Amino acid sequence: MQLHSRGSSLAMPPPPIPPRDYQGQQTAVQKDQKVSNSLFVPVSCDPPAVPCGSVHPVPLPKFYKQDKPVQTNNFYGNLLVGEQTLPVWTHPYSVWYSKDPDYVGLGISHTASSQKVFGDDPNANPVKYFFSPVGICSLLLTSQQLQHGHELLVGECERFSCGVRFDCSGKSMSVKLVQGMGFVTAVYDGLSPMIKSKVGIQNFQQKQGSELKKYVATLFDQTNWVIYSSGDLQLADAYTVVGTTPGLVQIAKLCGDEQPYDAAAGAYVDDMTLSGSADSVERYCFDYKLNGRSASGKTIQWALPHQYAVFDQSTASEAVNMTLDSTCKGPMKAYLTKQFVMNEELPPAEVQFEPWSQLHGFTGYSQDRLDCIRQIANEEVDSFDVVNASNTDSMYTAGKILDKGAFMLYVVAFVLKDAQLARKQLDKMKRAFHRFISNQQQAPLVYETNWKGVVSTGGLNDGNFYVDFGNCFYNDHHFHYGYHIHAAALVALADQSYGDGSFLKFSRAWVDTLIRDVANPSKEDSYFPVFRCFDFFNGHSFANGLFAHGDGKDEESSSEDYHCYYGIKLWGLITGNGQLEKLASLILGIEKRAINMYMLYRSDNTVVPPNFKANKVSGILFENKIDHATYFGLNKEYIHGIHMLPITPMSSYFRDPQFVEEEWNEQLSSVVGSLDDGWKGILMLNRALFDPKSSYEFFAAPNFQYKWLDNGMSRLWATAFSAGIGG
């Protein structure tokens, strides 16, 4: 049955042309928001706008102190689920809970770039994947008492840190894991320190230079490790160092000058907090809270390439002459500091709703382009039944379909300025959204009170993690909810000009709830963990939720990652929430730099191995591995296309013309002609980012076939977008 808009709305006179200053036209503001210049203020502290439930198939681990919502997609996730024995990457180190006989404790490893393993064919260029070996137990923090029984507890789980405690009859060994930490630090309470090595200790020597006892262990693999201790240590055998006094033990790998470690020894990071001001959005800080005392009053922290590329002079001046390789993200540099201060470049202010590219910005439309777009609109708006098409059991699929309809709405409302078509499409979009906002979809959402988040009920009761791509296990929430958030922003924009303006009020709490689930900026919002998906240290989001994985967290779509924060940016504009809009802009700025180092590879990329970068895109980026693949197949169009979709005004900010042209010429031009499904449309719209004319001609052609469209893609948006950037 074809759905039509209500007849009464068609008789209304056309509205005035909406101004381009979208932010200026918004009047809805948060009346209850506390006055603060911080970027990191709550979106809301209200109860979630979905029902509550107490069932979840993944049990919580044993905690020693955890009074906040628990992170689900974080770097220490392997310590929360399963056997809790898989590695955690703080970078540059990996650590893990070892249960091996005679080696019970916290294993420590660092792998150099020379140890990387390449495959399938290591001599190929490009290779399909590379990874760093795991489980090389260079050193292990333990105690003799732990070998005879203990309990592992995790606690104080924050966004950038997590505590691990080995309890033994009221005594303990505690380690705080912090991203980028310079030392692996253990505090022994009532237990005698013991350090073991599976590699073996060739030489163990006490040295001067620190207020603490200082030792250097040379292992049989010729790596050198420095150990600081508050008490005396002795080499018992080639695999064991023992101490007799409870207290502090710190371990780090030597990589040049020892003096910076000496200056930092005795102090360690207990937690890291974010700070940033809405008055200077591009500037953000990692503030490190230190425990203990060092000669310098500072500690060693390691930085990744996307960080030290934008360090403020105050941080850059604290660099020391030490470098260690990361697993997948190039060389890390060390800093003797208590704070990282970064000055990031932000997206251009004009990147909002209308088509935009780095080539020409927004070019506007000639009459013949408008005529073509109008013809397509008349066909597609009538034929696309968004109300029923979005009625699925998948938040991901439904989100893509809603966003397809929202892009179509934008075109008829703000490109064609066709009041009749706009109201017809707006009516359908509001009805489609009503199903989700009123939680009447096939698999309703629930706020589950164990891990504390909004999940699909699909798979929740039976633990089927294949349902909706693992949504109930916190997989891909920024992908799934990002589509809904973005679509809602476009509908709210159109409703202000062509409707009664009620959609914003009706949808506000629900959309805010989705935003809070994926990107809650503040601990003051006690319903959700802070920044579930986006990792400020790694510079991008992680999609993997409550699953143990031997290579750590991962992400296979850079584009659906930034699409989420693009949607949040637009929602901030629509709602008048300037701090939210600025926060999203900062995240987008960070992601642009990181993604173009670690996921999208121009020919001048110097971060990934030279024998991998000709792939042009990462495929799946893990914490310990990059695999040029997807979870749903190995076709070239899959691997590249999942890093493209959806193509939006934000796409060209990330995918610059040089990269897109290189990728097209080297990887895609030989493939696209043989495609006969939705991936063809994805690749051809991506072509608009360097060749908008060819892209426009493809979508505008009379013999265009709709089977060439992905289910989240419309011919109408593809034509309007490519035409609007010079096609």
Task: For each feature predicted by the language model, list its residue ranges.
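Active-site neighborhood of glycoside hydrolase catalytic domains
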Residues: V511-T513, S558-E591
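Alpha-helical scaffolds that organize eukaryotic protein assemblies
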Residues: L490-F536, G567-L570
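Substrate-binding surface in catalytic domains of secreted glycosidases
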Residues: D554
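Ser/Thr/Asn(+Pro)-rich, low-complexity disordered segments
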Residues: L3-H478, P521-G539, N544-G545, T575, ...
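Aromatic-rich carbohydrate-recognition surfaces in CAZymes
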Residues: T392-V415, N471-G499, F503, S507-V511, ...
